[in-house]
C-alpha cells in the first residue's frame, strides 16, 4: 500500500510539473499589451461587443462600464456616426383573470430582429390597469453622477390625460422601479425624445394633438419642467427634436425646412440656424408611418 501511495504521489507531482511547464509555454506566446493601448482598441469596438466583453475580467468591466473618458468617447462616436432609422422594439405581456394583451413600441426600421434581453425585466404589477391608455419608455444619462436611467411615463384614459411616472436606475442594487412625482399632469408625450446634457426633452400635448408644448425631465433630480419653445414647434406636427452639436434643436418641415437651436438651457433662448423653402419640390418628404411597408412609391413630375 505504501508503494502504491508513493507512486500515486509521484504521478500527481509529475503531472503538476507538466501543467506548470505547459502554462509557462502558453504564457510566453501571449503579448502583454499595455493598458492604454487596450483601452484604445476597446474604443473601436461596437457597443454590442463591449457589453459582452464586460465578462472578460473585472478590469475590463470597470473600463467599459465605469470609466468616464471611455464612456464619453463611445457617446461621441455614436453622435458622429448615428445609425439610420434605428429604434428598439419592446414587448410586454400582461395577463389577468379577465384579459390578456400585449403592449409594444413600434420600430422605424424594416429589418426587425426580435431578441430577449436576459436580466431586463419590467415589473408592472400594480401599475397596469384596464384604463391604461398608453405608456412610453425613455432612456436618459446623467453626466454628473454617471448614471443611466429609464423613465416610464404611463397615461390613463379619462377626459383628461392622467400621468404616473416611474424611474429605473441601471446598476441600482435594489433593481426596482421607483414612483416619482410627475410635475406636469394631463399631458401626452409626443415622441421621439432626445437626451442632452442630463435632460430628456420631448414634445407633449394635452388636447390630442391640437397644440403642443415642450417638456424637460432632469435625469439627476428626476423633476419635470416646461421649456419655452418657438411658435413653429408648438403649432406644427411635422417637426422633430434633435441633438444639434450638443444643444437642443428641432427640425420643422411642414412648408419649409427650418432648424432651431436652444443656445442656453437656463435662458431658453432660441435661434434659427437654417431656413429654406421647399415649395419648388426639390426635396420630397415621406411620412415616417409608411416606411414600415416593404415598398414605398414616390410619384413626382419633372417639367
Swiss-Prot record:
This is Putative F-box protein At5g62060. InterPro entries: F-box-assoc_dom_typ3, F-box-assoc_interact_dom, F-box-like_dom_sf, F-box_dom. Residues 27-74 form the F-box domain. NCBIfam families: F_box_assoc_1 (TIGR01640). PANTHER family: BNAA05G37150D PROTEIN-RELATED, F-BOX ASSOCIATED DOMAIN-CONTAINING PROTEIN. Pfam families: F-box (PF00646), FBA_3 (PF08268). It comes from Arabidopsis thaliana (Mouse-ear cress). PROSITE patterns: FBOX. It comes from the Eukaryota.
Amino acid at each position: 500500500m505504501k508503494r502504491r501511495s508513493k507512486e500515486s504521489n509521484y504521478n500527481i507531482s509529475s503531472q503538476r510539473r507538466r501543467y506548470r511547464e505547459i502554462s509557462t509555454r502558453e504564457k510566453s506566446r501571449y503579448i502583454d499589451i499595455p493598458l492604454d493601448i487596450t483601452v484604445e482598441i476597446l474604443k473601436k469596438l461596437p457597443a454590442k461587443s463591449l457589453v459582452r466583453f464586460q465578462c472578460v475580467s473585472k478590469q475590463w468591466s470597470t473600463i467599459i462600464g465605469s470609466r468616464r473618458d471611455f464612456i464619453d468617447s463611445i457617446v461621441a462616436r455614436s453622435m458622429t456616426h448615428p445609425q439610420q432609422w434605428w429604434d428598439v422594439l419592446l414587448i410586454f405581456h400582461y395577463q389577468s383573470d379577465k384579459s390578456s394583451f400585449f403592449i409594444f413600441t413600434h420600430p422605424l426600421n424594416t429589418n426587425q430582429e426580435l431578441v430577449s434581453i436576459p436580466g431586463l425585466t419590467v415589473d408592472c404589477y400594480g401599475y397596469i390597469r384596464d384604463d391604461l391608455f398608453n405608456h412610453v419608455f425613455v432612456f436618459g444619462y446623467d453626466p454628473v453622477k454617471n448614471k443611466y436611467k429609464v423613465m416610464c411615463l404611463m397615461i390613463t384614459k379619462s377626459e383628461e390625460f392622467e400621468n404616473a411616472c416611474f424611474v429605473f436606475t441601471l446598476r441600482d442594487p435594489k433593481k426596482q422601479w421607483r414612483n416619482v412625482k410627475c410635475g406636469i399632469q394631463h399631458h401626452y408625450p409626443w415622441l421621439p425624445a432626445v437626451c442632452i446634457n442630463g435632460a430628456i426633452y420631448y414634445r407633449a400635448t394635452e388636447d390630442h394633438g391640437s397644440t403642443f408644448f415642450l417638456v424637460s425631465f432632469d435625469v439627476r433630480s428626476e423633476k419635470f419642467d416646461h421649456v419655452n419653445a418657438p411658435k413653429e414647434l408648438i403649432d406644427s406636427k411635422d417637426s422633430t427634436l434633435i441633438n444639434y452639436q450638443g444643444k437642443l434643436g428641432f427640425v420643422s418641415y411642414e412648408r419649409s425646412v427650418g432648424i432651431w437651436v436652444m443656445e442656453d438651457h437656463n435662458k431658453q433662448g432660441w435661434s434659427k440656424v437654417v431656413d429654406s423653402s421647399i415649395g419648388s419640390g426639390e426635396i420630397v418628404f415621406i411620412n415616417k408611418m409608411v416606411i414600415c411597408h416593404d415598398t414605398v412609391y414616390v410619384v413626382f413630375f419633372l417639367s
